[in-house]
């Protein structure tokens, strides 16, 4: 099994671990008023990333775009968690474990993008020299 494929599988497992933590520790303890607004948005985002990771594992779609989307959604999820803490919908102690998992996921995504992402060649993405 190639290193890129193996790291992709690790990425999917790390995302599933994060999802389990978010569902069990963060969303379950949210106040009802926030669970159906911010919580629903967080759930939707988690499933969008899971869908992209399945596409990556099946090798369908543009790898670079999918990895980029996973990276953006992971950062968005971290922002949502920070917002939840600021509005007192999420306990402060829940931030650090979630942030550590998201940072680890970001590192894996960055490594995958570096080693084999099909970067689109356009004016927005000039060639590295």
Q: Which functions belong to the PLM regions below?
A:
Residues 1-129:
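Amphipathic alpha-helical assembly/interaction segments
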């Amino acid at each position: 099994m190639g290193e890129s494929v193996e790291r992709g599988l690790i990425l999917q497992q790390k995302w599933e671990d994060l999802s389990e933590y978010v569902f069990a520790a963060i969303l379950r303890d949210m106040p009802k008023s926030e669970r159906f607004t911010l919580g629903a948005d967080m759930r939707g985002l988690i499933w969008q990333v899971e869908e992209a990771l399945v596409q990556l594992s099946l090798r369908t779609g543009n790898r670079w775009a999918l990895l980029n989307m996973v990276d953006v959604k992971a950062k968005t999820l971290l922002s949502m968690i920070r917002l939840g803490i600021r509005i007192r919908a999420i306990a402060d102690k829940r931030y650090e474990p979630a942030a550590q998992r998201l940072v680890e996921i970001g590192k894996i995504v960055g490594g995958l993008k570096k080693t084999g992402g099909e970067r689109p060649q356009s004016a927005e993405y000039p060639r590295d020299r």
